[in-house]
Amino acid sequence: MDIKRTVLWVVFSFSLLMLWDNYNRYTGKPSIFFDNPTTQAAKPAAATDDGKTAAAPTADVPTSSAHAANATGVPDSVAPTKSEIVTITTDLIKADIDTVGGEIRHLELLTHHESSDSTKDIVLFDSTPPRTYLGQTGLIGGAYPNHKSLFTVRPGPRSLEAGDQVQLVLEAEQNGVKLVKTYTFKRGEYKIDIKHDVINKTAAAINPSLYLQLVRDGSKLNNESMFYSTFTGPAVYSDSDKFQKVTFESIEKGKIEHVVKAESGWIAMVQHYFVSAFVPPANVPREYFTKKLATNLYAVGAIMPMGAVAPGATQSMDATLYSGPQESKRLEAVAPGFELVKDYGWLTIIAKPIFWLMIQIHQLLGNWGWTIVVLTIVIKLAFFPLSAASYRSMAKMKLVTPKMTEIRTKYKGEPQKMNAAMMELYKKEKINPLGGCMPIVIQIPVFISLYWVLLASVEMRNAPWLWISDLASPDTLFGSYMIGSFHLTIGILPILMAISMFIQTKLNPTPPDPIQAKVMMFMPIAFSLMFFFFPAGLVLYWVVNNILSIAQQWTISKKMGIVN
C-alpha cells in the first residue's frame, strides 16, 4: 500500500473542498463548514457594493439593564436643524467629527493607501453611502445628551501644526445636564483620548451611564478574496473570558455569544489589517452589548455607570478610541489583550514567536520581501533533519517502485496477499511506509502558523520587493485582467510556484495508480491558478520553500543513486 500517496490524495481533495467552500462564502451562499458572517450583505435592502444603503437606525441609543425600567429613547423630532463637520488632521489620521452627537463620521489613515489605488487613503469610519461605520458616545439613564444631540464647538486649532497634540471640545446641554466631550489627538498616535465631563445643573442628583458604541454595516470589504477568508465584525474582550469574536450572522439571529458584564476589557470592530476599538477606563464595571440596529446595520458597545452626580457637581470618565492598523507594538500599548485582534488562527502560540523572529530579521534587512526569504531559510534549516528523514524515506520508496509494481501485477485481485507481500518488501528493504509522512505532519503546524502570520501582518501592505510593489497584493508583473466578475492578475511568482511543484512531483515516487498519477500532475496547475489570487508575500514564501525542498531532496536522491 502507498500511504503517502493516500495522504496526498486526501490533502488535495480537502484543498478542493475548501476552495469550493470559500467560493460559496464569497458569493454569499451558505458555507459547508463555517457560519457566514457576511450573509446579510447579499440582501437587497442592505448596504452592499451595488450602491444600496442601509436603512436608518430606529433605536440606536443603547439601554443598560440598570436603566431598563425608565429608559427613554431619543425621538427623531429632536434631530437638530443644522450640523457642522469639524476636521482634525494629524500626521497619521484625518478625522471628521459631526456636531450632531459629536460622533466620528469619517476617519482616514494618511500613511496607509488602498492596494488598488495608491492615491486613495484607507478609510475606516465612514458615512458615505453605501458605507456606514461610526464611533459614537453619549449618556443614558434619562433625557441626557447622546449621539443624536446637537453639540457646539469651542474654537481652537484643527491640526497639530508645531505642537504634539490638538484638542477638540464639544458641549451639549439637555434638561439641565451638560456633557462636555474632549477629543485629544496626538502626534504619531492612532489613539484618540476622549474625556466625558457630566455637569449637573439641575436641583436633584442624577445617575447617568456613559456608552461607547461602534456602528458598522455588515457588507463585505471590497478587496475580500474568494480564496482565503479573514474575519470582519465585532469583538469583545474581558480579563475573564478573553477575546471573543461575534459574527454579524449571530447578531442577526439574536444570539449573545460574548461576555455581558465585566470589570475590564474593550470592544472593537475588526477587519483584515485594521481595527477600531473603544477602551473604557480600567476597573470600572461595564455591560457589553451587540445588537442589530437596522437592515444590515450592527452595533457593539459598552455601558459604564458614572455614579451619582450631585446638583452643581461634575463627574468625569475617560475612554480611548483606537482606529488604525493592526501593528503589534501599537496594539500592545493600547490595552491588555488588544494584540489578539491580529488573528493568527488557532495556532497563535506558534505564530507569535514566528512574527517576533520576522521583526528581528526585518530590523537587520529593512525589507519585508527579503525578510520572508531569510525567514523561510531559517525555518527550513530548523526542520532540516526532519525533512531529510522524509526525503530519504521517499527516495527508498522510489528505489523499490519497480518491485512494488511487480507485486501489484502478481497479486492483482488478491488484496490480502498483495498487502502481505508489500509488508514483507518493506521489512526486507527496511522501509517505513509512514516514514515520508510523519516528518511532514510534524512540520504542518509551523507552516500553517507562518501562513497566518503572512496573511495577517499589516506590515506587508504596500511593502515592495524587487518588481513587486505590494507584498499584500497578488503579483501583477504580467498585467491585470477582468474575466467576467473575476479580477485576475498574472505574475511570475505563481508560475514559479507551478514549476517548482512540477519538479517536486518528478523527484517523488511515481504513484502506481494511473488516476493518482494524473492527479499529482494536475496539482501544480491547480495550485498555481489558486495562487494567482493570493498575496505575493505568501506565494514568495511557498516558492522559496519549494526551491529549498527541491535542492535538499535532489541532493539526498543523488547520494542514494536515484538521480544522475
Swiss-Prot record:
Composition-biased stretches (Low complexity): 43-60
Q: Which domain of life is it from?
A: Bacteria
Report membrane topology: Multi-pass membrane protein
User: Which segments cross the bilayer?
Assistant: 7-24, 293-313, 341-361, 364-384, 438-458, 483-503, 524-544
- Give me any GO biological process, just one: protein transport
Under Gene3D superfamilies, the record lists: 2.70.98.90
Task: Say where the protein is mainly found.
Answer: membrane
Per the record's keyword annotation, is Cell cycle included, yes or no? no
Keyword set for this entry?
Cell inner membrane, Cell membrane, Chaperone, Membrane, Protein transport, Transmembrane, Transmembrane helix, Transport
Q: Which InterPro entries match?
A: Membr_insert_YidC (IPR019998), Membr_insert_YidC_N (IPR028053), YidC/ALB3/OXA1/COX18 (IPR001708), YidC/Oxa/ALB_C (IPR028055), YidC_ALB_C (IPR047196), YidC_periplasmic_sf (IPR038221)
Q: Where is this protein localized, as stated in its record?
A: Cell inner membrane
GO molecular function terms here? membrane insertase activity
Q: Which Pfam families match?
A: 60KD_IMP, YidC_periplas
Instruction: Give the residue ranges for region: Disordered.
Output: 43-76
**GO cellular component labels:** plasma membrane
Under the heading PANTHER family, the entry gives:
CYTOCHROME C OXIDASE ASSEMBLY PROTEIN COX18, MITOCHONDRIAL (PTHR12428:SF65), OXA1 (PTHR12428)
- Function comment: Required for the insertion and/or proper folding and/or complex formation of integral membrane proteins into the membrane. Involved in integration of membrane proteins that insert both dependently and independently of the Sec translocase complex, as well as at least some lipoproteins. Aids folding of multispanning membrane proteins.
Q: How would you summarize the oligomeric state and partners of this protein?
A: Interacts with the Sec translocase complex via SecD. Specifically interacts with transmembrane segments of nascent integral membrane proteins during membrane integration.
Q: Which family does it belong to?
A: Belongs to the OXA1/ALB3/YidC family. Type 1 subfamily.
| Protein name in UniProt | Membrane protein insertase YidC
This chain's source organism reads Janthinobacterium sp. (strain Marseille) (Minibacterium massiliensis)
Source taxonomy: Bacteria, Pseudomonadati, Pseudomonadota, Betaproteobacteria, Burkholderiales
